[in-house]
Amino acid sequence: MKAAIIGHGKMGREIEKILLERGHRIGAVIDEANASELDAAHLAGIDVALEFTTPDAAYGNIRACIDAGIPVVSGTTGWTNRLEELRSYCREKGGALFYLSLIHI
């Protein structure tokens, strides 16, 4: 599996480590410094995006992945007031979103 990690803080770095230990590949690491790279061109060949950012960034990050045709797993909390909107958008675009509100590693 080739993953994109969106949010390279403590959780993002831990997920990266686990993925690599299990033989998966990291195709992109997106954080504040290169957020403009969250588009279809930079996500080409990615199987899944793992999104662990901030509530303010999560909605746009998830939408960008859906627009790029990349399934998303998000563990960012604090943005679920827009979850229904994203569910509708996923259905409309044929996208996939798996949201987890509490993750322990």
Report each predicted region and the residues it spans.
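Glycine-rich adenosine-cofactor-binding loop
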Residues: 2-14
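NAD(P)-binding Rossmann-fold cofactor-contacting core
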Residues: 21-38
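Short amphipathic alpha-helix with an adjacent loop that forms part of the alpha/beta core around
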Residues: 37-45
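N-terminal Rossmann-like NAD(P) cofactor-binding module of classical short-chain dehydrogenase/reductase
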Residues: 49-50
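ADP-ribose/adenylate-binding Rossmann-like module
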Residues: 64-82
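Rossmann-fold NAD(P)-binding glycine/threonine-rich loop
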Residues: 76-98
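Conserved small/polar residues in nucleotide/adenosyl-binding loops
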Residues: 103-105
